[in-house]
Amino acid sequence: TAAQSAEAVSVEFPTVRVFVPGTQDAQITVGAVGETGTAAGNSYAQTVKAGNVAEIPLDHLKDGNFDVTVRSSVPVVAAVRTSVIGTKTRDFAWFVSSPPITDSQLVAVPPGPGPRLHFANAADKDVKVKIQPESGPPISLAVPAEGGTGAAVHSGRYTITGGDGLVAGVSFTGDGQTSAFAVSPAGPLASPIEVYPH
């Protein structure tokens, strides 16, 4: 069982939760970079003891979309929690890490409030991607080096091309509503799934 650190963080603030599964303490550095057109980010550093779970608050960030990078001296498990407060309700979402996507990636966006497709680029060169919906014109994006960007989308299926090495995710945001999921490439041993009609 993992021990919980004594530091409590308000659920209203964005937070990185980190678990150190090994036997060595982790030197953690967290970077938050605003997506294109949003506020600038910040960086944070903390030591997390082996076998512990700790929360690192992402304070001093303005409202907006951010790409969060966690660097550690030893292997860790990490995710980002954000929250929204609406007129009548509040909600929170976990943004989990994911492996880089491939050059041709299929994404299914379910119905939900304010869906948005996000891209993060850890490389030192800008990357141009094309997002092709099932019908209608494609969306072209330039993802800056060591930064990120995103685009508003609708529910449906999209094919992303040119995004090899990028990390992608989908978020939903409405009045007192939020959710998110990572876009993951197919596994090396994945096989087609046959779906039979009723």
Residue ranges and their predicted role:
Residues 65-74, 155-172:
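Short, aromatic- and glycine-rich surface loops/edge beta-strands on solvent-exposed regions
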Residues 7-85, 116-118:
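Extracytoplasmic/luminal low-complexity segments enriched in Pro/Gly and acidic/polar residues
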Residues 25-35, 124-137:
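Short, surface-exposed beta-strand/strand-loop-strand elements in extracellular ectodomains
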Residues 1-22, 76-125, 132, 150-152, ...:
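Conserved functional hotspot residues at active sites or interaction interfaces
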Residues 17, 27-29, 45-47, 128-130, ...:
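Ser/Thr- (and often Asn-) enriched beta-sheet segments in non-cytosolic proteins
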Residues 35-67, 88, 134-159, 179-181:
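A cross-kingdom feature marking solvent-exposed beta-strand/loop segments within repeated
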